């Protein structure tokens, strides 16, 4: 199970679009689930335990995963920073 859920990431994305007024809505939820699974695999199978490394995985994987129509990099950055903030 992901430390950060797809529902949370979608909420972050929607808030970014609302606040900035820039970008188009739309999410490929299956792609997003795959992105989050990739992070889980790194944590559990490659023993990634460092919080900063996990945060980096969130930022990079969400940005490169292109689960959203617009705002992937912004969402990746915001999710990464939020993850660090709540830890």
Label every model-predicted segment:
Residues 1-87:
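FIC/Doc superfamily catalytic core
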């Amino acid at each position: 199970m992901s430390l950060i859920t797809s529902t949370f990431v979608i909420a972050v994305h929607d808030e970014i679009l609302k606040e900035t007024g820039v970008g188009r809505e739309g999410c490929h939820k299956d792609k997003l689930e795959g992105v989050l699974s990739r992070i889980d695999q790194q944590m559990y199978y490659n023993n990634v335990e460092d919080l900063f490394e996990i945060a980096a995985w969130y930022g990079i994987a969400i940005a490169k995963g292109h689960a959203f129509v617009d705002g992937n990099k912004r969402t990746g950055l915001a999710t990464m920073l939020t993850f660090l903030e709540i830890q």
